[in-house]
Amino acid sequence: MKEYIPRTTILRLSYVITAFVVCLTLSIAHSGLVNAQEQNNNTLMQSQGTPSMTTTTNTTNMNIVLVHGTYVDGSSWSKVIPILQNAGHKVIAVQLPLHSLADDIATVKRAIDLVGGPVILVGHSYGGFVITNAAYNNTSVKGLVYLAAFAPNEGQSLSNFIDATKLPKGFLVVDNGGFVYINPEMFAQAFAQDVDPAQAKVMAAVQKPFNQSILAEKSGPPAWKQLPTWYQVSGNDRAIPPDVERMFAKQINATTISLASSHASPVSHPNEVAQLILNATKGAK
């Protein structure tokens, strides 16, 4: 004989089972959320990092903006940046468009605003032309460092200092858009003869061409008349004659050092270049 369970009992059991399942589901979900939150918190802590135990020597609170020249990009500072950072400085290496002087100046001004003052500007090669203009009347900038760089006076252009007729045949290549770059086969010997050959080949491959119209663009009022300056002469430079560099150093009344370096001094002599920049952070007011 079959026993029948009353319908009301079945309904009550159904409610109990349903409630149990819901509670179990919520419990699992809550546990998952807690674990996920804990994982997120751990990830956040890892991304923020624990306070570094490394002792820094930055007592000046001076930030640094590095400005490359033509035929290179911001990666040319890759050996200098860690030295400056390890000394406790905030560092930005810009990527110049190299389409016009105005665009390049604007790029550096944005970097100054981003990093905040006080700031030391460092220019290599054409980068010196740019910082001369970008720092003018900018109260955040406290000093200028020129590395084998152009330091023009008002009204001067790159064409005042570069004589294309004296360059080796085939040295420069101009593309259909009017952008200039160095023949990769001649890059190392003309620009970076003291750089490891393998690295020089990489530099040639990633070189950044510039709009040839930049050669004729004139400098505005120079910031080096307003600020303390430092200059590094590359004694073995084949891109800018060392005598021209010495002329610039004298013109801007710079604290000057000379290195037995190619034009690519930030790459071949990063320690000496970094030390000059660090000296500037201490000497600028």
Where are these regions (language model features)?
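Conserved HGGG/HGGXW glycine-rich cap/lid loop of the alpha/beta-hydrolase fold
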Residues: 60-101, 119
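Active-site nucleophile elbow and catalytic-triad environment of alpha/beta-hydrolase enzymes
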Residues: 202-223
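Flexible "cap/lid" loop of the alpha/beta hydrolase fold
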Residues: 140-141, 145-184, 211-214, 248
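Active-site loop/oxyanion-hole signature of alpha/beta-hydrolase fold enzymes
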Residues: 90-120, 133-136, 159-163
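Bacterial N-terminal signal peptides
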Residues: 16-29
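Short beta-strand/loop motif that positions the catalytic acidic residue
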Residues: 231-233
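Conserved loop-alpha-helix segment in the C-terminal half of the alpha/beta-hydrolase fold
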Residues: 235-267, 280
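Gly/Ala-rich beta-loop-alpha elbow adjacent to hydrolase catalytic centers
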Residues: 122-127, 131
